[in-house]
Structures are given as structure tokens and as C-alpha cells.
Amino acid sequence: ITQIEIDKSIVCFVAISDTQEIAGKVSFKLREGNIVRYQDAFVNENHRKKGIYKMLFDARQMYVDVNYPNHKIEAYCRDTTLEMFKKNGFEVKRNLYLVEK
């Protein structure tokens, strides 16, 4: 897992496969009011079901715990990742809806 600081407010964690392709990524954004917003999680289809998302999630969480211990963490997640968040102490605050036109 490689950590990349995009700018002063976005940090991305990238998993690189043995063949040097991007296997997955997660990131977070620093927001006003001491808020860390988790965003942009993705694991390449060829690398799913191998524990990569958990490794990325854990790397990001450890980084935030060490560097931003007094920040509130927010995240929007899908049904497929909700249990991972709950296992890590997150609570569902509200349901959101995806709409498009």
C-alpha cells in the first residue's frame, strides 16, 4: 500500500499488484471543522475478493488515527462496504439516495 498526498487536503492510498498495476485505491479529504471525509474507494475487478479493500481501509484508518486523532470521520458507503465501516466503529447517521436525470 502506497500513500500519496495529492494536495494539502486529499490523501490517497494505492494498492499495487505484483504486475505493477493499480489493484485498488481509497482516499480521504480534509474538510473544514476538523472533519475527515473518506471517499473514492475502488478495487479493480481482477483483484476483488483478495482482501485488498480491507488492507486499504486499514492503512487509511491507521494514518488518520495517528495524524488526525481529534477529527470527526465521515464517509458515504455502499451496501457492500457498510459492514466494514460498522466493524470499525462507524454508525449509520442517515440514508442517502442516488438520483440522476
Show the residue positions of the predicted features.
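A structural microfeature
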Residues: A23-G24, R94
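Conserved acetyl-CoA-binding loop-helix of GNAT-fold acetyltransferases
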Residues: K49-M62
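Conserved GNAT acetyl-CoA-binding A-motif
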Residues: V64-C77
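A conserved beta-strand-loop-helix scaffold within acyl/acetyltransferase catalytic domains
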Residues: T2-C12, S17, G24-F42
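Residue-level recognition of the GNAT/N-acetyltransferase active site
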Residues: N44, R78
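Conserved catalytic-core motifs of GNAT/GCN5-like acyltransferases
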Residues: E74-Y76, E91-K101
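Acidic/histidine-enriched, beta-strand-rich ligand/metal-binding domains
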Residues: Q39-D40, R48, M84
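Conserved active-site tyrosine of GNAT-family acetyltransferases
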Residues: F85-K86, F90
